[in-house]
């Protein structure tokens, strides 16, 4: 017989971890289910050494540091954590929800979905023979191992710009983007323009030059032109973003806006008792940032507590008054 939880949180990224901690502070019985092999979501797995700029009060905070702080905060409570476990169905029963997963089943009074963009994998570089090259990378692990190496980065979003600025401190760095304008925070773009990073726009990669195992040069072609250039490099980083999959979400019977769960001001979905927070939810004016999701977590938790027991106030005491 499965234990009955007050709140089951689907997703163990930053927003899910904070929601679990906050739920414990409301003395709820909580568990976390995550399809990934470790806690922390994208910041922990894809950006462990990248600085995160939208967590107030913590300058120069990396994805790994954020994850470790949230886990440390949660470790003060007993929280069952189910990793490598994918939620398949969420069924409403008389007084609780039955969650069917790839490994079993769970009973819970309420559900908070904090699954971000879902399962993710990097958008690949689509050039001939790309699979064989060992020095083409899609994420950064231990940035110091690239010190003094010639680094080239492909992409024009926040990740590409931020990594270019990070690599510039330790290595000769080139950034290639197919457009003249970057899709990144204005402050970061200004810092890039004032940096020593070699910027190649509007160029796109056109040919890999190497022995099939080690890439030595990258040919780039100017957009809408036959003009080409060749870049010498030791490592190539592809920052084209990620393909996300929400998996079985569409089968959970919730109203969606494209692939996001529509919520009201309580962070409640179209099914009473099921809430959504972070990048997986949608409402008018929604901004996808870690900081936004962290703020949505207490709203969902407090309303879940009130759903379980209407005698419990939605507005709790402030932690400073406890």
From Swiss-Prot:
<feature type="binding site">
    <location>
        <position position="87"/>
    </location>
    <ligand>
        <name>FAD</name>
    </ligand>
</feature>
<protein>
    <recommendedName>
        <fullName>Ferredoxin--NADP reductase</fullName>
        <ecNumber>1.18.1.2</ecNumber>
    </recommendedName>
</protein>
<keyword id="KW-0560">Oxidoreductase</keyword>
<feature type="binding site">
    <location>
        <position position="34"/>
    </location>
    <ligand>
        <name>FAD</name>
    </ligand>
</feature>
<feature type="binding site">
    <location>
        <position position="42"/>
    </location>
    <ligand>
        <name>FAD</name>
    </ligand>
</feature>
<comment type="subunit">
    <text>Homodimer.</text>
</comment>
<dbReference type="InterPro" id="IPR023753">
    <property type="entry name" value="FAD/NAD-binding_dom"/>
</dbReference>
<feature type="binding site">
    <location>
        <position position="320"/>
    </location>
    <ligand>
        <name>FAD</name>
    </ligand>
</feature>
<comment type="similarity">
    <text>Belongs to the ferredoxin--NADP reductase type 2 family.</text>
</comment>
<keyword id="KW-0521">NADP</keyword>
<dbReference type="InterPro" id="IPR022890">
    <property type="entry name" value="Fd--NADP_Rdtase_type_2"/>
</dbReference>
<dbReference type="GO" id="GO:0050661">
    <property type="term" value="F:NADP binding"/>
</dbReference>
<dbReference type="GO" id="GO:0050660">
    <property type="term" value="F:flavin adenine dinucleotide binding"/>
</dbReference>
<dbReference type="GO" id="GO:0004324">
    <property type="term" value="F:ferredoxin-NADP+ reductase activity"/>
</dbReference>
<feature type="binding site">
    <location>
        <position position="120"/>
    </location>
    <ligand>
        <name>FAD</name>
    </ligand>
</feature>
<feature type="binding site">
    <location>
        <position position="279"/>
    </location>
    <ligand>
        <name>FAD</name>
    </ligand>
</feature>
<keyword id="KW-0274">FAD</keyword>
<keyword id="KW-0285">Flavoprotein</keyword>
<dbReference type="InterPro" id="IPR050097">
    <property type="entry name" value="Ferredoxin-NADP_redctase_2"/>
</dbReference>
<feature type="binding site">
    <location>
        <position position="47"/>
    </location>
    <ligand>
        <name>FAD</name>
    </ligand>
</feature>
<dbReference type="Pfam" id="PF07992">
    <property type="entry name" value="Pyr_redox_2"/>
</dbReference>
<dbReference type="InterPro" id="IPR036188">
    <property type="entry name" value="FAD/NAD-bd_sf"/>
</dbReference>
